[in-house]
């Protein structure tokens, strides 16, 4: 609902809104899916909802996680969206996601151009993305006979006794070193140059964008 509020009468703004599948089934968010019905693409911006579906919330399965792709597409099509599904368990999913994001962006621009050229667009069907990955993906897969990745357990404190338990400490070390931090950070300047080049310029970072906090900056440096 906050994302949709931000784009009202703000035609140049596109908000990518990431929603977890547990969050998505709560009352307030479940209702907010229908706000697309109040958007005029001629005068307002657009929201690109991204439902991150990993099948579990903090202590159990989610509703969306128990639905087939066909059921998910039917549901969100009924909500007025054009659903696009991305799923996978390996690094290829990043390329798939990049491609789908570009497709979704072009669809949004096409709808807006048509509406702003004077054509009456009734009930525009904006895209939304369903990103399906395992719960706790890239984390600890199993520990002491319990399945962690792909389970609600990955949402808990997985290794509470790593300080004293050698098995848990080894699992923690294997997990964290799998991210190859030495390839990402430099001891003297933090992030390596390849990472720094990907960072947005000042003014374009999410935390400094006025749309993320409702207006011009109200907290200033002393």
Locate each region found by the language model.
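Thiamine diphosphate
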Residues: 1-48, 95, 99-116
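Conserved acidic/glycine
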Residues: 23, 46-222
């Amino acid at each position: 609902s906050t994302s949709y509020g931000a784009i009202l009468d703000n035609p140049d703004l596109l908000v990518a809104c990431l929603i977890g599948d547990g969050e998505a089934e709560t009352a307030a968010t479940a209702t907010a899916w229908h706000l697309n019905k109040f958007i005029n693409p001629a005068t307002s911006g657009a929201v690109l909802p991204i439902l991150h579906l990993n099948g579990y919330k903090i202590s159990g399965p989610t509703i969306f996680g128990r639905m087939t792709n066909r059921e998910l597409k039917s549901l969100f099509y009924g909500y007025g969206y054009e659903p696009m599904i991305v799923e996978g368990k390996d690094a290829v999913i990043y390329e798939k996601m990049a491609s789908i994001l570009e497709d979704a962006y072009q669809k949004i621009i096409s709808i807006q151009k048509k509406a702003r050229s004077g054509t009456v667009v009734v009930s525009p069907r904006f895209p939304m993305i369903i990103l399906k990955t395992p719960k706790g993906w890239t984390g600890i897969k199993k520990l002491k006979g319990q399945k962690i990745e792909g389970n609600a357990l990955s949402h808990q404190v997985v290794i509470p006794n790593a300080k004293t338990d050698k098995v848990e400490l080894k699992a923690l070390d294997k997990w964290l070193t799998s991210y190859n931090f030495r390839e990402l950070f430099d001891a003297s300047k933090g992030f390596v140059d390849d990472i720094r080049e990907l960072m947005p310029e000042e003014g374009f970072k999410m935390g400094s964008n006025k749309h993320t906090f409702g207006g011009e900056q109200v907290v200033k440096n002393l």
